[in-house]
A protein has these predicted regions:
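Donor-nucleotide binding loops and adjacent catalytic segments primarily
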Residues: 32, 40, 47, 57-62, ...
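Conserved nucleotide-sugar phosphate-binding/catalytic loop shared by glycosyltransferases and other
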Residues: 7-15, 38-94, 181-183, 336
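C-terminal alpha-helical cap of glycosyltransferases
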Residues: 369-385
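An amphipathic, basic-hydrophobic alpha-helix
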Residues: 81-113, 131
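C-terminal "capping" alpha-helix adjacent to the active site of nucleotide-linked donor transferases
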Residues: 327-334, 338-355
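Active-site-proximal region of nucleotide-activated glycan assembly enzymes
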Residues: 6, 38-43, 67-70, 130-195, ...
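A short, well-ordered alpha-helix in the C-terminal region of glycosyltransferases
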Residues: 355-369
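Acidic donor-binding loop of glycosyltransferase active sites
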Residues: 111-113, 279-294, 302
Length: 385
């Protein structure tokens, strides 16, 4: 006689950027995989923003998640900004309607638990969970907790963080609920696809010149793009440069995009090939958003980090970069240090294979042996049962 499967329902909440979505989908995939091995059936729903870019990013991601998620549910989503804006007042109405939508959706779905991956869209579902007495987990990907995590942490069953030191940023009364998990990364980043990356880039295996991957993000990073353009002669002489510029920079600088050759390969954006391209790289020059940072870290790639530190940022990228710098796992260029001379100094150091190996060894220690996605999925499944 076949044993009846236990059936659970889990709701995921998060959005705003791919950094809140892709890691969550990785957890959803792993949770489904783990459930099968435990003879458990899980129905997963995702709550995200109903409007603008947020919805399109989430829905595009859900299409490629392998069927792990049953449905996407859009809610109104406001935002509390760190500066004065009239929209702070109008967004209060969005937050209210987002809460009402979350409350009735969760009451209908009756989930066993909710997993919050962050972004302000996760706040109202977590508040509704608290009212409905639905247990929820919240995960913080950055070194310092963001506003959404701080708001969600009080009622959370478990607070999952990427770094042990992050615990110190929470109230002492909450620290017993904290679990250090690392930041979840899609499994494809753990696979050795460097040959596929070289093939995509048109770089033969016989070419021994170090590959420098420059990540400006999907929207681009003007500071990083300018550093590359200003030092292109030096870079091409010493490296094969793979430059993801972002669409805006590509549209505004067609001559640069057309100037590609065997030593300089500009791309507006690299899509599904990104995991294999990172694996093919020897050095990465990048911002220090949590998602891209950990994608490079789990592949043990030496990094030069140029964190975003404008007035519109809470400084999370600086904190992330400083952590890796202090662990001897990356160079950091911030403020007055983000100059051509400093960049070249860092690159000259990383031309030494021994130095690159030192950074790689430090990254392996940071990331640990257990995959964060497995640790998180295990915690969620264990708490449900």
């Amino acid at each position: 006689m076949l044993e009846n499967k236990k059936k659970f329902c889990v709701v995921f909440a998060g959005g705003g950027t791919g950094g809140h979505i892709y890691p969550g989908i990785a957890v959803a995939d792993e949770l489904q995989s783990l459930a099968k091995s435990h003879n458990v059936e899980i129905e997963i729903h995702w709550i995200g923003s109903s409007s603008g870019m947020d919805r399109s990013i989430v829905e595009k991601s859900l299409v490629s998640c392998g069927g792990s998620i049953t449905a996407f549910h859009g809610i109104a989503c406001g935002k509390l900004r760190r500066y004065f804006s009239f929209r702070n007042f109008t967004d209060l109405f969005k937050i209210f309607f987002g809460f009402i939508s979350s409350y009735f959706l969760l009451k209908k779905l009756k989930p066993n638990c909710l997993f919050s991956k962050g972004g302000f869209v996760s706040v109202t579902p977590c508040r509704a969970c608290k009212l409905l007495k639905i247990p929820y987990f919240t995960h913080e990907c950055d070194f310092t907790p963001g506003l959404a995590t701080r708001l969600n942490s009080g009622g959370a069953k478990k607070i999952l963080v990427s770094y042990e030191e992050t615990s110190g940023y929470f109230k002492e009364s909450l620290r017993s609920k904290i679990c250090v998990t690392g930041n979840p990364v899609r499994p494809v980043f753990y696979e050795d696809n460097s040959s596929a990356g070289r093939e995509f880039l048109g770089i033969p295996e016989t070419n021994s010149k170090p590959i420098l991957l420059v990540l400006g993000g999907s929207l681009g990073a003007l500071q990083i793009n300018n550093l590359v353009v200003e030092n292109l002669d030096y870079l091409k002489k010493n490296f094969i440069v793979i430059h993801q510029t972002g669409k805006k920079f590509a549209d505004e600088n067609p001559k640069i995009m057309e100037s590609g050759d065997e030593f300089y390969k500009p791309y507006a954006f690299i899509y599904s090939q990104m995991p294999s391209v990172i694996q093919a790289a020897d050095i990465v020059l990048s911002r220090s958003g949590a998602n891209s940072l950990w994608e490079c870290a789990v592949t043990s790639k030496p990094m030069i980090l140029v964190p975003l530190c404008s007035n519109g940022s809470r400084g999370d990228q600086v904190d992330n970069a400083k952590y890796f710098k202090d662990k001897n796992a990356a160079f950091m260029l911030v403020g007055e240090d983000a100059t051509s001379d400093k960049l070249i100094e860092c690159l000259e150091s990383l031309k030494d294979k021994t130095k690159r190996e030192q950074f790689s060894d430090s990254l392996k220690i940071i990331c640990g042996k257990e995959k964060p996605v497995s640790r998180i999925a295990g915690i969620v499944l264990e708490e449900m049962q």
